[in-house]
Amino acid sequence: MCTRVVYSGTNGMVATGRSMDWKTDMHSNLWVFPRGMERNGETGENSLKWVSKYGSVVTSAFEIASTDGMNEKGLVANLLWLPEAKYPARDKSKPGLAITAWVQYMLDNFATVDEAVAFIDEDTFQVVSDMMPDGSRLATLHLSVSDATGDCAIFEYTDGKLTVYHSKEYKVMTNSPTYNKQLALDSCLPFLYA
């Protein structure tokens, strides 16, 4: 099971780490991207387009996706598997963003979690999932972002709707269950963090 953790230490030190527990080789590489790159949401008709504001370094998966990374402002984004994820049907009236580019979009455009959450709340584009490279199943993922202040947000699609969980307290995320259930479990198990 993949896990993402944010640690806030003394003197303003913040570190984000994650485990990648996948059953097959994801053919991962490190990619470094400069600012000023023209990007495309890779969804075909009416794909989202943007130019990166920030440089970033990312880990790739299957040579097509940015799964984890950090930009020059200290924003970190991580994609983790979420079997319960359910995305809305494609609405071509909204620009589309492939789920494989979700991390990169965050890193390219936002310096802080507050900025990312405020923009996502405007609901101006649609995240679009696709089949895994082996064709076995739909990619079902949720996204976490953290920043240099230790602020955190979790973005999940369930029942076709996006839910955003935003708090400096949301420092741990695993694959499953959905984040509302992870929070409920956390409140039942306070002795684990004593």
Model-predicted regions and their roles:
Residues 82-84, 112, 123-125, 148-151, ...:
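Short acidic/polar capping segments at secondary-structure boundaries
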Residues 46-60, 110-114, 118, 181-194:
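A short, charged
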Residues 133-193:
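Extended amphipathic alpha-helical segments with heptad-repeat/coiled-coil character used for oligomerization
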Residues 118-134, 142-145:
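Secretory/export targeting leaders with adjacent low-complexity proregions
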Residues 62, 98-99, 137:
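Short, glycine/acidic-rich beta->alpha junctions
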Residues 29-32, 39-43, 101-104, 168-171, ...:
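Glycine-rich loops and low-complexity Gly/Arg-rich segments
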